[in-house]
């Protein structure tokens, strides 16, 4: 059951697709708490959700702010990351319910932080819709929520192959060399992602003709090898009288404005930039169709970045800071009381300043709306602009699209990656724990920067992260300029194991793709915590580092440096697969309970649940070469029992998802 409660004058976020009447009266489970709400938690209660947020799967014990932020330090003390995903699921004894706070500005959550037995939340202004979902278990409530917010984005099938990316591929030859090296080292590859270096002066929808003289030919040459080019698009439009996107946006009045009606300006990668007012339908249509400059070159996929929006500085704030520094110029000794707040704090405060976010406006139905009041909609609205345009630019075809910033609702138009993480073992664990949370909120096509984006990775971290990343829908190796090059062929000491693991990803695609399509078409889960399927098992409720994957698998990644095994909890008997390659593994049936399982660096652990089948193909160099007509069936069946598996296989490129012939039933009988 879904109930909607409305307060004040909610902003139309368009997060939901169902129109429900507002109810009055008390809200079940909640009591008023000043301007917000609270509920008492028992000692055993668990709270799930909030999507892209720090900390574990169970969010209890910390406080959070839904406030899309360009946060480069992904540490446990942070309160916000790139997405605002205001869905919570509470399990307390036999009580289970979900809450969705539909509000475009800041939402503050205290989940057992100030008081361990109390959950409270409030919005920045008193205008919001609150949805209560009840009457089922965790999986049923998540399914109901996904019905409320609409079908998740479905990418092309080739987007489930490996993507190699780096901020630092500066020329066409750099890109071609990556493709050559992957082929030379016999490593499968489906995508090469291009960062801002392909652009002319970092301006959207342009190509630097000196560095990339013929993007159309480059795209065609790579596509002939089964590899797609995936370029980046940033939110800021370069201030340049010779740039058509800039001049058209100015002429049409399509950029966000300050209070005096002049366009808001802030600096990002191209220097001074304007920002499209994505909350206006006509602006979304205009900006989205700008992608045509690249789809005409044969490009079939994009990633949107810097769209919180990230602001390096505004000219006004930079000028004030420099004037303040000039006042300190003649001082021989700057006391720490001045140095830290004025110099360090002043410099750090230039970027993503709350004052800047409060200084420009959107136009909504002819009315001015201050940006900070609807801030969390911006990145998702950019995704929507592109997603809607692709239906015109590439009719009937799927286009790959994923974004850094997001809001519930934008999951219908694209996926997400989990932002600028770092190369650390802690970030590998964070990746594991964040996946079920973002997928609860509809972002099925999601993944982290494998190996880590910032700082230098190591061969063992690269391999262990791959052993989990090969299970995530978006499987992308991405890193920052100035860090160690981390293409998978650069680790000779672990290269055979890396090759086996990438090939294992491709072999598992009949299962992984089927489970993704079930989740998208039937509003079920791809990743989920053990607690969702075993709610009455107190040990399962406390597992934070194992995930159920679709119907039949459980993953237990190794995420500790130098570890050669790990503890695993099995809520029921399962078949262990200790995999070194798709055709090289040990299997063992283990009873329910706690186990310590050895796992060498070149091995990964998967567990087959009883009564289930996992179809496995022969590995391929890319998804277009994958032959899933001849399959091996992994299974865990008691003697004399049989099982079925619904496998999904379509053309992988058109939007005709729902044809019955896409489904094939596989059967096995264990005699």
Give residue ranges: language-model regions.
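Catalytic core of carbohydrate-active enzymes
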Residues: 75, 377, 383-399, 405-416, ...
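A conserved hydrophobic secondary-structure block that centers on an alpha-helix together
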Residues: 77-78, 152-155, 165-219
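Extracellular structured ligand-interaction cores
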Residues: 82-86, 94-96, 104, 127, ...
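Aromatic- and carboxylate-enriched substrate-binding clefts and catalytic-loop regions
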Residues: 188-498, 534
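Glycine-rich, histidine-containing beta strand-loop boundary motifs that form or position
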Residues: 31, 41, 91, 100-103, ...
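A residue-level signal for conserved active-site and pocket-lining positions in enzyme catalytic cores
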Residues: 87, 145, 182, 222, ...
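Short, hydrophobic/amphipathic alpha-helical packing segments
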Residues: 64-65, 81-84, 176, 284, ...
